[in-house]
């Protein structure tokens, strides 16, 4: 079995799990987010947990993480760098849960909202990067380039803070291991199913920090078939 997955293989894993193994996408997202939340709890952040959610399923993972950490009694704040009306599928379903729970969240967040949230963070807080997923290639566009730069600057100035990346540090090409202009420098990366190719190539190790492979319920037979090809 291969030790790593490429971008295309990662996409294929999800597609086969849903279409051939009849695993609903919302179940995979729930497993991913719940297990990330459990890992975050094990890291025992003493301050606030600030979750940065982007568009698409990476943001949806962030919503699941926010819900489970909030339910566990942790101090959670959510910044959503997207218009919630643009969410669809599993991400939309989980955003509806967030709004029904009235969890502290700022939608249509801006770089100014991030600056204020970072300024208000207590020491030893944890920042969850659920901005951009494995599909990123080319150059990171506005406003995410500015957001990533601000998070990295905060990390440099606050050595007791933890930056926790969901699946892949935002802006890191998961095939080449090179930043797409800019990329989150994570202390911890929780990646789904298997390590990504870019974690062990290029500059990947400089951006991922400590890596953890998260089980999202993919049948071993699927992985055996895919990685044998």
Curated annotation (Swiss-Prot):
Positions that bind K(+): 58, 129, 170
Catalytic activity: (6R)-NADHX = (6S)-NADHX; (6R)-NADPHX = (6S)-NADPHX
Keyword set, alphabetical order: Isomerase, Metal-binding, NAD, NADP, Nucleotide-binding, Potassium
Ranges for domain YjeF N-terminal: 10-224
PROSITE patterns: YJEF_N
Statement: the UniProt record of this protein carries the keyword Hydrolase: no
Cofactor dependency: K(+)
Note on how the cofactor is bound: Binds 1 potassium ion per subunit.
Gene Ontology MF terms in the entry: metal ion binding; NAD(P)HX epimerase activity; nucleotide binding
EC number(s) on file: 5.1.99.6
Family: Belongs to the NnrE/AIBP family.
Protein name, per record: NAD(P)H-hydrate epimerase
């Amino acid at each position: 079995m291969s030790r790593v997955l490429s971008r295309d293989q990662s996409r294929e894993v999800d597609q086969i799990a849903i279409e051939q193994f009849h695993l609903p996408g919302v179940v995979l997202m729930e497993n991913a987010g719940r297990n990330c939340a459990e890992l975050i709890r094990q890291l025992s952040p003493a301050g606030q947990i600030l979750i940065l959610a982007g568009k698409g399923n990476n943001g949806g993972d962030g919503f699941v993480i926010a819900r489970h950490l909030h339910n566990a009694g942790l101090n959670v704040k959510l910044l959503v760098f997207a218009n919630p009306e643009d969410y669809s599928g599993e991400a939309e379903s989980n955003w509806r849960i967030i709004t029904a729970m009235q969890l502290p969240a700022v939608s249509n967040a801006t770089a100014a909202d991030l600056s204020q949230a970072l300024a208000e963070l207590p020491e030893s807080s944890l920042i969850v990067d659920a901005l951009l997923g494995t599909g990123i290639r080319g150059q990171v566009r506005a406003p995410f380039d500015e957001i990533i730069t601000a998070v990295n600057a905060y990390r440099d100035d606050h050595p007791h803070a933890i930056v926790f990346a969901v699946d892949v540090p935002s802006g890191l090409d998961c095939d080449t291991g090179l930043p797409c202009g800019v990329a989150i420098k994570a202390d911890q990366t929780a990646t789904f199913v298997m390590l990504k190719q870019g974690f062990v190539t290029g500059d990947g190790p400089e951006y991922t920090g400590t890596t953890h492979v998260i089980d999202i319920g993919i049948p071993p037979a699927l992985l055996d078939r895919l990685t044998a090809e």
